[in-house]
Amino acid sequence: MNAPQKHSAPITVEVALGDRAYEIVIGRDVIASLGERIAKLRPGARTAIVTDRTVAKTWLKRTEEVLDQAGIAHASVIVGEGESSKSYAGLEQVCEALIAAKIERNDLVIALGGGVIGDLAGFSASLLRRGVDFVQVPTSLLAQVDSSVGGKTGINSPQGKNLIGTFHQPVLVLADTAILDTLSPRQFRAGYAEVAKYGALGDEAFFAWLEANHAELFSGGAAREHAVATSCRAKAAIVARDERETGDRALLNLGHTFGHALEAATGFSDRLFHGEGVAIGMVLAAEFSAERGMMPATDAERLAKHLAEVGLPTRLQDIAGFTQEGLADADRLMALMAQDKKVKRGELTFILMEGIGRAVIASKVEPAPVRDFLQRKLAQA
């Protein structure tokens, strides 16, 4: 893989979806162009900024300033932080606030935040007046490389993650890499799991580049922009081929079947961030694949080694409160995986691996070997 160049101008990645195509604009301080871009996209539109309390303290004023400079009217909706806001109550709060702000069909909702805000604001926009367009301004690494791109929106159910939702594409994504400087180390690491996922599922050269360059990526600079852009290009290409996840878009769920079950078992709490669940889930998927003879055990070890090297959890035992009831229970985890979105007619579908850079969709996976695998992993505590 070629070394990244220093970018004096933003990088633009197109999501090619015909008359619903949109741009992902990546670079430092691209948020400064938000007002100008909205004015061109939707002249005369009013906006409502949906964000959470933490992001509001740092980025709401800046966002309002760039909208003011472009003469764009704006309201704001502030919700609590974390997965608890991705709920029926959170959806009601946002929808009612948008209605109170008199947001109409020709106006825009702005999702200013991480993956939770993007999912919640996008879902609310998709429902409001049967569909209002929205703009993604992702403020976490995870959101910039994954959840802000592709149009998946939704909330969680007590029975599982992202079970209530819609496909609703944004009209613009602004990925300001300067915003990532304000993330905690743990938040940044969690987002990095999704970056590594793109290499693990379909680009061994990118994975090797990450192994060699992750230190520079974590410290900022051109490597960070290169990683975000490479990740977005990978996702944009898959979304353009399979917008509604009827085929190979499911590959993007590498690590998510195990990971979502672990998130649900931990109550969608700060005990396990989404990216951390994905990291553990990818390692479990790789190890399960190796046990089935699908990939070399050395590749599974390589994946686990790299994720651990950057500080991500890679084992069930790395989760806080691991021994609490509901987590160290193979049957409970199997029941949660049975609610996975990829389940068809009650049969499990996993994203497994044939090697680094070669993920595959495995349909009709028998539950007994999965349960046995989990029981053995749990017994290693």
UniProtKB/Swiss-Prot annotation:
It holds the Pfam family DHQS_C. GO terms for molecular function: 3-dehydroquinate synthase activity; metal ion binding; nucleotide binding. Binds 1 divalent metal cation per subunit. Can use either Co(2+) or Zn(2+). Its EC number is 4.2.3.4. It is found in: Cytoplasm. Keywords: Amino-acid biosynthesis, Aromatic amino acid biosynthesis, Cobalt, Cytoplasm, Lyase, Metal-binding, NAD, Nucleotide-binding, Zinc. NAD(+) binds at residues 81-86, 115-119, 139-140, 152, 161. It catalyses: 7-phospho-2-dehydro-3-deoxy-D-arabino-heptonate = 3-dehydroquinate + phosphate. Its main location: cytoplasm. One of its GO terms (biological process) is aromatic amino acid family biosynthetic process. Zn(2+) binds at E194, H256, H274. Its cofactor is Co(2+); Zn(2+); NAD(+). GO terms for cellular component: cytoplasm. Pathway: Metabolic intermediate biosynthesis; chorismate biosynthesis; chorismate from D-erythrose 4-phosphate and phosphoenolpyruvate: step 2/7. It comes from the Bacteria. Belongs to the sugar phosphate cyclases superfamily. Dehydroquinate synthase family. Catalyzes the conversion of 3-deoxy-D-arabino-heptulosonate 7-phosphate (DAHP) to dehydroquinate (DHQ). This is 3-dehydroquinate synthase. It comes from Rhodopseudomonas palustris (strain ATCC BAA-98 / CGA009). The lineage of its organism: Bacteria, Pseudomonadati, Pseudomonadota, Alphaproteobacteria, Hyphomicrobiales. The gene is aroB.
